[in-house]
């Protein structure tokens, strides 16, 4: 029906492009007038455009500067300060409106200038990433359309090879004229550096400065790069700098400017694929014990080996049962036990491809799940541990606990969690136990619970490391470190770690150094970071499949840009084989055939392991080829440059799927162009489309096909049932291949299922983070004000006014003058001695005024006694140190709350609503503590004696060293294959750090390790 209306009225994208066409005509008209000008005259035209922008914005900037000067006046009243702040907010809105209007006016002129600059640069020879390059780009009309779409804050979907990098220069150049800084966001450091060097001539011609942020840069260098008119960098680097700036001790330590305009290259990769996990700055946990995984690793290795022997016996039993004419039900049970015990067993995955086997397992599983009481425990009881691969969970069985207790020579109860509620209730109900003894017994119950829960957690994480995570697939080991491989790009992710102790478990498994535990110091999700920008735009070749998510989460519209030349690439239906071995043999044979013909071929793989397997097979056939994967990425540019030459064979992970331009060599067009051979379907259709898009660029010929087997991860977990039944009905034998559009559609349905589940994960993550994001904005705004304001006196006195009102009101209700005196003395170091009769007779307001006048007089005397500069430093220190300390504690408390909130669902309560309420209560408490402690410090702090200055300087030096130890992590969630049952990624559903063992002494404000939920100082810390 939709297609019928589109034929009559035209599609949305056609209408979008039609609206822009008059602007394109105007740009081309203006460009024609620029051609006769000299280079200097063209530069002068650009300066005129810049002057128009400055002329529009300078009056507003001048008004704003005057208002900020008034705010710094020490004598300003609270009412005047509030009024001025409101005026500043209104001016900020006016500034954005004026900016948008003036840029819209000069857009045709600016784009014409950029187009003519590109024309003048033709033939210019320069260096890009150490290789000689010649400028040969002038924007086509379709590229001008893409540039207009980007400037308007939308997503420009352009087919691969249509020159997105050049398109980005148009809106970047235009918005750089404001001098506010434009950020070009790429997916990795290589592309950031390459694009900066590649596009620099256009900007350099007109004196527009261009910088790039790289992972290795120091803060001083980063600041210089951010001061440029245009800055290239990765989403992680921009995000981590934002977090670090909000932990800075002085304004000089901050590196970023305001967030004005960001253009995100490969926007689907950054805003969707990367959005399931937050950016986290973490610091070391003091006194953390890293030996716990090494201690239990030998037990787990033996347990895993025992499970392997057990599943091997089940497989032998199943193979016997499958020989019968009618499959034995016991064979189905044996196979189900293998699925639950060792789902990645190679013998098992081969059996799955046999006719009727997958259906037998599904029927058996349904039988055991059918009853309300679920008999799945009967299946699992024969195993040492049960694996749910889709949910990424592992449960130790009674048999496994028995095995571990014998190995460790410990009571099997040590591997069971005590029922805390029941045991505490029993202690409370026992009247024969004295009150002091009850406290001791409860403490023992809490201690046992904390100890055992930590041990069981570590066992589960080690079992996951051995059962669900494979070296050279999910991760690689390089230079004695476990490095995660990005499932979407195939690149190594330096600095990224699995959370909740899983990374340490993998380090123990691989016998490399186990890094220390960390705690969250600052965090933000990708979604909420990019919402900081006043204007956001993006470009990619594959956005339409996620258009609804882009609009729902980011309010970004997607506009499909027509190609400059028609796409002539031939996309063939998938070729489906029963086993991986058959598939790999077929791939090797196809590559050999193509090389003999001379047609270049790019073999796309989803993991390092597969790329190396295929490489070995091609070497055995003496086929010369290049390999590009996370282990061998140094020659990336060279390998990509050679991939389009006649007879070239390139095996690459998803690294070659984005941002790479494979140019065809001489004679290749006549051979059919580049041949794309996908060795497996990815969980995302977009990644597959990106791979196909390496061929057929700019009207070039090309071909693409995917080779799929029923043992592939996607097929095994989500899509194989229907395909297997079709193959069974058709009576396919080993080695046969099935090729049909129905099969291809079935595979795409499986991909859609995974994409929907991933969207649910991202949406849920965002719903939870939105709660923390509102709190983060309040805290970071306060902190930045504290950092940037010359004077904080008005803020301190504002806090004092509130303090006087609330404190007097609290004690006036009880008429307790002594308590009021004691509190004021303790918190402000002021002697306030109101007359008892006056206190009872007068109202709250007069008494609060008396306290305020007394405190204000004290503070003014302090300002006179202490040098101005030192007084300002005291105020700054009071604001910043208190915010930092309490915000870290708050993040820990939020982590703890988030970890257990899903259990509320068992009480018929919505976990999200419960989380919002609890988080709000914690935040109100946080603000109260921050305000009170800030005020108290501002009143109590005095300059130190010269003899103590050296000690304080040493303390500052130690704090700076600790800051260096902070680690930037983009926490890894993995794919939907490793998601929790409730659709949340494992690394997000769990706490960022495991329970700390009781021999690691917690801080006074840390949560007590006994599990009571109280702070340590209010629980077991009292005894200490």
Swiss-Prot record:
Its EC number is 7.4.2.8. Disulfide bonds: none annotated. It comes from the Bacteria. It is an enzyme of class 7 (translocase). May bind 1 zinc ion per subunit. It is a peripheral membrane protein. GO terms for molecular function: ATP binding; metal ion binding; protein-exporting ATPase activity. ATP binds at residues 143, 161-165, 661. InterPro entries: Helicase_ATP-bd, Helicase_C-like, P-loop_NTPase, SEC_C_motif, SecA, SecA_CS, SecA_DEAD, SecA_motor_DEAD. Its main location: membrane. Residues 970-1024 are annotated as: Disordered. Residues 1014-1024 have a biased composition (Basic residues). Its cofactor is Zn(2+). Zn(2+) binds at residues 1008, 1010, 1019-1020. Keywords: ATP-binding, Cell inner membrane, Cell membrane, Cytoplasm, Membrane, Metal-binding, Nucleotide-binding, Protein transport, Translocase, Translocation, Transport, Zinc. It catalyses: ATP + H2O + cellular proteinSide 1 = ADP + phosphate + cellular proteinSide 2. It is found in: Cell inner membrane; Cytoplasm. One of its GO terms (biological process) is protein transport by the Sec complex. PANTHER family: CHLOROPLAST PROTEIN-TRANSPORTING ATPASE, SECA INNER MEMBRANE COMPONENT OF SEC PROTEIN SECRETION SYSTEM. NCBIfam families: secA (TIGR00963). Part of the Sec protein translocase complex. Interacts with the SecYEG preprotein conducting channel. Has a central role in coupling the hydrolysis of ATP to the transfer of proteins into and across the cell membrane, serving as an ATP-driven molecular motor driving the stepwise translocation of polypeptide chains across the membrane. Belongs to the SecA family. Monomer and homodimer. Part of the essential Sec protein translocation apparatus which comprises SecA, SecYEG and auxiliary proteins SecDF. Other proteins may also be involved. This is Protein translocase subunit SecA.
């Amino acid at each position: 029906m939709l297609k019928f209306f589109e034929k009559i009225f035209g599609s949305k994208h056609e209408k979008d492009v039609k609206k822009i066409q008059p602007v394109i005509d105007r740009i081309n008209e203006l460009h024609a007038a620029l051609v006769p000008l000299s280079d200097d005259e063209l530069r002068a035209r650009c300066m005129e455009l810049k002057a128009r922008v400055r002329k529009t914005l300078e009056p507003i900037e001048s008004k704003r500067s005057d208002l900020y000067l008034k705010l710094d006046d020490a004598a300003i009243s609270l009412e005047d300060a509030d009024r001025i702040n409101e005026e500043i907010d209104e001016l900020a809105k006016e500034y954005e409106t004026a900016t948008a209007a003036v840029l819209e006016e000069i857009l045709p002129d600016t784009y014409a200038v950029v187009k003519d600059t590109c024309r003048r640069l033709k033939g210019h020879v320069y260096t890009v990433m150490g290789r000689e390059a010649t400028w040969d780009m002038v924007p086509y009309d379709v590229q001008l359309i893409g540039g207009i779409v980007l400037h308007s804050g939308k997503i420009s979907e352009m087919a691969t090879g249509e020159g997105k990098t050049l398109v980005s220069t148009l809106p970047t150049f235009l918005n750089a004229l404001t001098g506010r800084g434009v950020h070009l966001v790429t997916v990795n450091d290589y592309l950031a550096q390459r694009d900066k060097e590649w596009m620099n001539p256009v900007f350099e011609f007109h004196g527009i400065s261009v910088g790039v942020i790289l992972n290795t840069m120091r803060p001083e260098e980063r600041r210089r790069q951010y001061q440029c008119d245009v800055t290239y960098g990765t989403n992680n680097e921009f995000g981590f700098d934002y977090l670090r700036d909000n932990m800075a001790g002085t304004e000089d330590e901050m590196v970023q400017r305001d967030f004005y305009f960001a253009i995100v290259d490969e926007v689907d990769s950054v805003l969707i694929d990367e959005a399931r996990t937050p950016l986290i700055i973490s610091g070391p946990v003091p006194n953390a014990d890293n030996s716990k995984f090494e201690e239990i690793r030998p037990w787990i290795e033996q347990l895993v080996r025992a499970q392997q022997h057990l599943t091997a016996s089940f497989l032998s039993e199943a193979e016997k049962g499958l020989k019968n004419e009618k499959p034995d039900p016991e064979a189905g049970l044996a196979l189900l036990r293998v699925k639950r015990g060792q789902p990645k067993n190679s013998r098992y995955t081969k059996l799955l491809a046999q006719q009727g086997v997958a259906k037998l397992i599904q029927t058996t599983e349904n039988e055991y799940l059918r009853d309300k009481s679920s008999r799945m425990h009967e299946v699992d009881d024969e195993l040492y541990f049960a694996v749910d691969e889709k949910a990424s969970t592992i449960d130790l069985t009674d048999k496994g606990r028995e095995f571990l207790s014998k190995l460790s020579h410990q009571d099997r109860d040590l591997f069971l969690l005590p029922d805390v509620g029941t045991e505490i209730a029993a202690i409370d109900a026992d009247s024969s136990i004295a009150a002091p003894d009850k406290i001791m017994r409860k403490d023992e119950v809490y201690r046992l619970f904390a100890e055992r829960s930590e041990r069981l957690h570590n066992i589960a994480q080690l079992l996951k490391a051995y059962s669900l995570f494979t070296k050279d697939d999910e991760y690689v080991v390089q230079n004695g470190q476990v490095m995660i491989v990005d499932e979407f790009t195939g690149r190594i992710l330096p600095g990224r770690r699995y959370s909740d102790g899983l990374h340490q478990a993998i380090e123990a498994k691989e016998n490399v150094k186990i890094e220390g535990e960390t705690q969250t110091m600052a965090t933000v999700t990708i979604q909420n970071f990019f919402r900081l920008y006043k204007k956001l735009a993006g470009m990619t070749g594959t956005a339409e499949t996620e258009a609804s998510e882009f609009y729902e989460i980011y309010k970004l519209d997607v506009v499909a840009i027509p190609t400059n030349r028609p796409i002539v690439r031939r996309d063939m239906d998938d070729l489906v084989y029963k086993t991986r071995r058959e598939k790999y043999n077929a791939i090797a044979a196809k590559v050999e055939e193509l090389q003999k013909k001379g047609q270049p071929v790019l073999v796309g793989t989803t993991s390092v392991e597969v790329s190396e397997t295929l490489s070995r097979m091609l070497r055995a056939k003496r086929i010369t080829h290049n390999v590009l994967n996370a282990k061998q990425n140094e020659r990336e540019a060279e390998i990509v440059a050679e991939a389009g030459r006649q007879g070239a064979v390139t095996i690459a992970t998803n690294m070659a799927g984005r941002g790479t331009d494979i140019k065809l060599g001489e004679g290749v067009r006549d051979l059919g162009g580049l041949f794309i051979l996908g060795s497996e379907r990815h969980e995302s259709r977009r990644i597959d489309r990106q791979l196909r898009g390496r061929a057929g660029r700019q009207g070039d010929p090309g071909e693409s096909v995917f080779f799929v087997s029923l043992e592939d991860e996607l097929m095994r977990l989500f899509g194989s049932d229907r395909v297997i039944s079709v193959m069974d009905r058709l009576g396919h034998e080993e080695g046969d291949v099935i090729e049909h559009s129905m099969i291809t559609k079935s595979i795409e349905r499986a991909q859609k299922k995974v994409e929907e589940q991933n969207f649910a994960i991202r949406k849920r993550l965002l719903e939870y983070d939105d709660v923390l994001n509102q709190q983060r904005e309040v805290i970071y705004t306060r902190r930045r004000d504290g950092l940037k304001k010359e004077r904080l006196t008005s803020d301190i006195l504002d806090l004092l006014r509130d303090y006087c009102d609330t404190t007097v009101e609290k004690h006036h209700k009880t008429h307790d003058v002594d308590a009021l005196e004691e509190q004021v003395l303790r918190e402000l170091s002021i002697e306030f001695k109101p007359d008892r009769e006056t206190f009872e007779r007068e109202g709250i307001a007069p008494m609060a005024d008396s306290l305020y006048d007394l405190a204000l007089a004290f503070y003014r005397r302090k300002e006179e006694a202490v040098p101005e500069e030192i007084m300002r430093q005291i105020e700054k220190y009071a604001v910043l140190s208190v915010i930092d300390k309490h915000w870290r504690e708050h993040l820990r408390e939020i982590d703890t709350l988030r970890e257990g909130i899903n259990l509320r669902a068992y009480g018929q309560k919505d976990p999200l609503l419960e989380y919002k309420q609890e988080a709000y209560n914690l935040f109100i408490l946080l603000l109260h503590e921050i305000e009170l402690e800030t005020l108290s410090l501002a009143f109590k702090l005095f300059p130190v004696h010269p003899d103590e200055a050296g000690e304080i300087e040493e303390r500052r030096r130690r704090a700076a060293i600790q800051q260096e130890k902070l680690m930037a992590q983009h926490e890894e969630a993995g794919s939907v294959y490793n998601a929790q049952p409730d659709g949340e990624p494992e690394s997000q559903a769990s706490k960022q750090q495991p329970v700390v063992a009781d021999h690691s002494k917690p801080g006074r404000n840390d949560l007590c390790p006994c599990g009571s939920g109280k702070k340590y100082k209010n629980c077991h810390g009292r005894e200490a």
